[in-house]
Design a protein with these regions (language model features):
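Short linear loop/turn motifs
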Residues: 66-70, 235-240, 396-400, 434
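Glycine-rich cofactor/substrate-binding loops
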Residues: 2-41, 107-108, 275, 290-457
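A helix-coil-helix interface module used to build multimeric assemblies
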Residues: 2-211, 216-218, 222, 285-286, ...
């Protein structure tokens, strides 16, 4: 006898309502981001099934394949309008799409899962989604780096006290500070490229991790979906679930750490005690009690959200660390973790790019911050130029710090012209990296979208 508090799913199993809600989790919401990619994966799979030769009877004919692909294109169109629903009894996007196709195409819709498991289905969906999102994030990352370069170029050689241990150290410039952060942001492309390469592998056809007794052409779906290669071992394809999510989260967490340091510098340098930079008022909030306050809440939240993303990365790694071979339901949560990290990083990059674009420099405040001690190393090096050994020059200055005098900060920074220092910053290097990375991301996105358009027509 069926329990009153139960529901029948598309797989014909009757599940207690509380169990269904607990196991489905947030998938009915999260999987909205995967509808397009699930349809793309299904289109590739059905196309491949229609091309299998040597069977007594085709699993799917070419005509049927075309009908399925047309219906999948309709599902994507509905999803783009917000009109495609993933129900709780669907459990996920895969069963929702199968239900929709079965409702429209009858028995033909029931054929699309042949030779597949939801294990390799979700793995394909997630990898296609991560590939697309990495490329979009790379463009956002480049936009922030460009904003920092523009900010630095406008300030040019405005002197800025360089700091170590947060203490005054040596003469620097605003441009050096800004482009230094721009370079750190750009360097994060390496981490995203590593995550992209890992995601760019096709698990489709591995089914539940052990293959199927059908002559599936896995290389064909790799070609149709635009992956660089197939994950050869079916068990290995199953084991790789969660790995690309964790790798993506690692890149996201590392980037957030870089952005958090940028945010901290901007908080400090915009304090009244420093006042080197002025943050745009629209990015600051007031106080409910102190009328004079303009707080850098946005930048403080960048620091706070960094803790969140690092936490999600740690959660993903912990999820995997003692998991037995083969699929385990724990892996469902890897999707939630990377999607949260993705959205946090995307919004952070966008708001920081706008904030940097609206930030201004107080050149007088920057120059006024130079104390005699900031020039100590320069004084010692002038002694070296006069023939004094470095260590003797160092101790001579160290022993007579009270004799140091203020110097012209502008002249001090102009004395540094070798590669990468105050007057040795080549903006062209950064602009070329930004241009090349943006162009490559757009080219890859166009190729991925091209695969999608070809399959869903």
């Amino acid at each position: 006898m069926k329990a009153k508090n139960s529901k029948k799913t598309i797989t014909d199993s009757t599940v207690d309502q509380d169990v269904l809600t607990y196991t489905v989790g947030e998938d009915t919401i999260l999987d909205k981001a995967l509808i397009k990619w699930d349809c793309m994966g299904t289109a590739a799979h059905v196309t491949m099934l229609s091309e299998i030769k040597g069977l007594k009877r085709p699993i799917v004919t070419k005509k049927e394949s075309a009908l399925v692909r047309k219906e999948l294109a309709r599902v994507v169109s509905l999803a783009e309008k917000g009109a495609f629903t993933i129900r709780e009894d669907d459990q996920d996007v895969h069963m929702a799409v199968e239900r929709a196709l079965t409702e429209r195409l009858g028995d033909l819709g029931k054929k699309i899962h042949t030779g597949r498991s939801r294990n390799d289905q979700v793995a394909v969906d997630v990898r296609l989604h991560i590939k697309s999102e990495i490329l979009s994030l790379e463009k956002e990352l480049c936009a922030l780096s460009a904003a920092l370069c523009s900010f630095g170029a406008k300030a040019g050689a405005v002197p800025l006290v360089g700091r170590t241990h947060l203490q005054p150290a040596m003469p620097s410039t605003v441009e050096m500070w800004a482009t230094g952060h721009a370079e750190m942001v750009l360097d994060q492309l390496e981490n995203f490229e590593a995550a992209y390469r890992l995601a760019d592998l096709n698990p489709l056809g591995s089914a539940a991790g052990y293959g199927v007794p059908l002559p599936l052409d896995r290389s064909r779906t790799t070609e149709l979906l635009g992956f660089s290669r197939t994950i050869h071992n079916c068990f290995g394809a199953s084991m790789a679930r969660g790995e690309c999510e964790a790798s993506f989260l690692s890149a996201l967490a590392q980037l957030m750490c870089v952005l958090s340091r940028l945010a901290e510098d901007m908080i400090i340098f915009s304090m009244p005690e420093f006042a080197y930079f002025r943050l745009p008022r629209e990015y600051c909030t007031g106080s409910s009690i102190m009328p004079q306050k303009y707080n850098p809440d946005v930048l403080e939240l960048v620091r706070g959200k960094t803790a969140q993303v690092v936490g999600w990365q740690t959660a993903a790694l912990t999820l995997l660390h003692a998991m037995p071979g083969g699929y385990n339901r724990d892996l469902q949560d890897a999707k939630l973790l990377y999607m949260k990290g993705l959205e946090t990083v995307r919004t952070t990059l966008r708001i920081l790019a706008k904030l940097v674009a609206g930030m201004t420099v107080d050149a007088d405040a920057c120059r006024a911050a130079f104390s005699p001690g900031v020039f100590a190393t320069d004084v010692a090096l002038r002694k070296v130029a006069a023939g004094v050994p470095w260590r003797d020059a160092y101790h001579d200055v160290r022993d007579h710090l009270e004799m140091l005098e203020s110097e012209d900060a502008d002249a001090a920074v102009k004395a540094k012209s070798h590669e990468g220092t105050c007057l040795g910053i080549d903006l062209g290097i950064y602009l070329k990296r930004i241009s090349d990375a943006t162009a490559l991301a757009e080219k890859r996105l166009d190729a991925l979208e091209g695969c999608c358009r070809k399959l869903l027509r």
